[in-house]
Amino acid sequence: MKYMITSKGDEKSDLLRLNMIAGFGEYDMEYDDVEPEIVISIGGDGTFLSAFHQYEERLDEIAFIGIHTGHLGFYADWRPAEADKLVKLLAKGEYQKVSYPLLKTTVKYGIGKKEATYLALNESTVKSSGGPFVVDVVINDIHFERFRGDGLCMSTPSGTTAYNKSLGGALMHPSIEAMQLTEMASINNRVYRTIGSPLVFPKHHVVSLQPVNDKDFQISVDHLSILHRDVQEIRYEVSAKKIHFARFRSFPFWRRVHDSFIED
C-alpha cells in the first residue's frame, strides 16, 4: 500500500512523522507522495486542510487520516500516543472508508476570462473588496433576496463546526448531503431586509450570488483567500466529489462536537 505523511512542521509533528515512516518500514508499505492511497496528516485541522487541497484531484483514490499534536480537531482525531497502533492497523488494511460531502464554488467573470472552480472541505466566504457588499441571492434561478452586509458564508456539513458556527449557523451531521448559507452582519431596517436566518440547501440546489454594483470580491475557500475582479456570478452547489476517511473505530460526530465545544 502506498502512503504519504504530511506534518505541521513543528518539532513534535516532524519527529512523529519520522517515527511512523520507520514503523511502516517493517511492513509492505511504500512511501509515495505522488500517488498515495493513504494520506496521513500530523498537526491539526489546518494541516489537514492543506493535505486535502494538495490531493483534491485524486480524492477517489485516497483515504485520509488525521493525527492531532495539539488540540482535538474534527479531522485530526488520533493522538500521538496511538501512532504505533495506527501503523499496525494500516499495515493490515483493517479500516473502512467514510465519506463526507464537499462544496463546489464556481466564479464566473466578465467577457474573455475563463471561469474558476474551487473545492472546499469547510467553507467558502464572500466579502467586498472594500466598498459596500451588495449581491442578489438567486436560488435555482429564482430571485430570493438582495443581501446587504459584511458578507456571506457557505459551508459544508463538516464545515458547519468552523466559521459557520461563529456566525450563529446550525451544526449539520456530515451524513447529510447539503450546504448551509449564513449571513455576516446583514443590514436590516425599514428599507433593507434579508431573511436573517441560516439557510440549508439540499443536494442538486444551486445558489447564485450576483453583484449589484461592485464586482470585485474577496473570496475564500477554506484557508485560501483571493481577490477576484470583474466577477459576474458566484455559484455554490454540493460537489459530486467527496472526501474519504480511513476509519478504524467508532468516533461519532456528536461526540466530537461535545469534546471540542463542551468538554473533553
From Swiss-Prot:
UniProt key word Chloroplast: no
Keyword check for Hydrolase: no
Phenotype upon changing D45N: Only minor changes in the structure and a 10-fold decrease in the kinase activity
Cofactor: a divalent metal cation
Quaternary structure, from the entry: Homotetramer.
Subcellular location: Cytoplasm
Pfam families recorded: NAD_kinase, NAD_kinase_C
Name the record gives this protein: NAD kinase 1
Lineage per the UniProt record: Bacteria, Bacillati, Bacillota, Bacilli, Bacillales
